[in-house]
A protein has these predicted regions:
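C-terminal motif of bacterial Sec signal peptides marking the signal peptidase cleavage site
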Residues: 17-20
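Generic hydrophobic-segment detector
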Residues: 10-11, 30
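A sequence/structural signal for flexible, mid-protein segments enriched
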Residues: 22-313
């Protein structure tokens, strides 16, 4: 038996010993209490600015199996949720999908960018039904949640946004594909730190995010940058390398480009990293949050919308 082979066996035995002696890592959310989860936003987008809305749910244990019956108890009801802009405080009202008329359901689906009928659950959201508060750039908003004996708070600021210089389509790189086009944008990045996110809608579909929808300007601060944006895969669409990220010519495209703050960026960055880091050898990822007393995100958004028809190039 060669010395190299003996060394290899010794090394392998050492690796097995080291890993077998490691203490099992159990995330705190498995053994401890299960905090409430907030997903809330307020958006500044000119005439398309939106009032605040908040989803309030219960968290599940990390290794739990979730059944349809448990989803009936997923949403937290009868919470007192307020949003303050530093001058006034606004009370949000709970509204559930099953309580809406068909016309109201369609409006809610378009507003939230979700096909609510396909979810199979009674989605509930807290809204400013008075439409008294809309997002404004540069303003700070404080969220307060009182539910099930718990108090949750969070603060977000809507950044000042800069419009994209150009939004256009080009021939895809690589082999010729006369039915497809690539979306590209030009951004003049402001000198301060900036964090971005984007959504895309094709035709009358809902706005959808790419698997890597957030990015920052650490590598191109205060520069003029041209870069592509992918078309997200539609639900049920299989991955095809030859068409991935590309748009079919002759279709209508809407781009929603977001300026967000650092905490908002960090939340989605960890969400998307966890989603892409799956498999038997993946690591447990702790999702970032700006919610004091709970989990989730309270995010301010400065958004610009761009409508384009994919041309025949």
């Amino acid at each position: 038996m060669s010395r190299f082979f003996l060394f290899f066996l010794q090394l392998l035995a050492l690796i097995v010993l080291v890993f077998s002696c490691q203490e099992e890592f159990i995330p705190a959310t498995v053994a401890g209490p299960h905090p409430l989860v907030v997903e809330g936003y307020i958006e500044a987008a000119g005439e398309r600015s939106s009032p605040p809305y908040v989803f309030l749910t219960r968290s599940f244990p990390f290794f739990s199996q979730i059944s349809g019956e448990e989803f009936d108890d997923f949403y937290v009801h009868d919470a007192e949720i307020t949003v303050s802009d530093g001058e006034e405080e606004y009370l949000l009202t709970e509204l559930c999908f099953n309580d809406l008329t068909p016309d109201q359901r369609e409006i809610a689906a378009n507003f939230l960018g979700r096909n609510l009928d396909s979810l199979g659950i009674n989605l509930c959201v807290y809204l400013d039904l008075s439409l008294s508060l809309f997002g404004e750039e540069g303003k700070t908003y404080t969220l307060s949640v009182e539910a099930e004996g718990e108090t949750l708070t969070a603060v977000t600021t809507i950044p000042e946004q800069v419009s994209l210089d150009s939004v256009y389509f080009v021939e895809p790189p690589g082999e010729p594909r006369d039915t497809l086009a690539q979306l590209r944008v030009i951004l003049d990045d402001p000198p301060e730190d900036n964090w971005y996110r984007y959504f895309v809608r094709v035709g009358d579909d809902a706005f959808r995010r790419d698997n890597f929808s957030v990015f920052d300007d650490r590598l191109f601060a205060d520069e003029r940058l041209e870069f592509p944006l992918n078309r997200p895969l539609a639900p049920g669409e299989s991955f095809d390398l030859s068409t991935f990220g590309l748009f079919r010519r002759g279709t209508d495209m809407s781009l929603k480009f977001l300026f967000i703050d650092e905490a908002h960026h960090r939340f989605w960055e960890t969400i998307e990293f966890a989603a892409s880091n799956q498999g038997p050898f993946s690591n447990y990822t702790r999702i970032a949050t700006n919610i004091e007393g709970g989990l989730g995100i309270w995010g301010g958004i400065a958004a610009s919308y761009y409508e384009r028809r994919v041309p025949d190039l």
